[in-house]
Amino acid sequence: MNTRLRGLQASDGQLPLSAPHWLTERAFRQGDIPAVRRFTQAFGARRGIRSARLADFVLAVSEAAACATAVGPCTARVRLWVTGSRAFCEVRGNGMLLRRSARGDGRVRAGGIPGEEEAMRRLVLKQLSDYVSVASGPDGVCVLLSMRVA
């Protein structure tokens, strides 16, 4: 299976992708976040990730999935893999997380105001992950994260 991240440049903060040992992916919608958590839990258990780190990874993936689907009905895809002692997650959704304000003075949520929930999700992601990137553009939202699991 091809594990390259399409559409990313080196300057976009692309995660290292050397020979993943496990790769799995799943499509989901906003209401499927509990299923994404179960999917991640099963992935981590099969990979042998320690219980405490697995709980952190499941929470981080759940928050990444929530970020990608936060603004309403959209479809998204979560990809999970392990390389060496690190677990990686990529979540891509076709919704718009952020848009430019009419005055061009900053980015705001698609609903028009900065979201406290979004800020909290990003804080949780930053605290749990060794690396996290959240990007929104015309093609949707992309969340990348990695954490040491061994």
Give the predicted meaning of each segment.
Residues M1-R26, T69-A150:
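Conserved beta-strand-loop-beta-strand hairpin that lines the nucleotide-binding pocket
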Residues M1-V58:
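Bergerat-fold GHKL ATPase/HATPase_c domain
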Residues R37, V61-S62, E118:
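Generic non-transmembrane alpha-helix signal with a bias for helix starts/N-cap capping motifs
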Residues T40, A65, R122:
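Generic structural marker for isolated residues within well-ordered, non-membrane alpha-helices
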Residues G44, A60, A65, A87-C89:
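Small side chains
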Residues S51-A76:
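Conserved ATP-binding N-box helix of the HATPase_c
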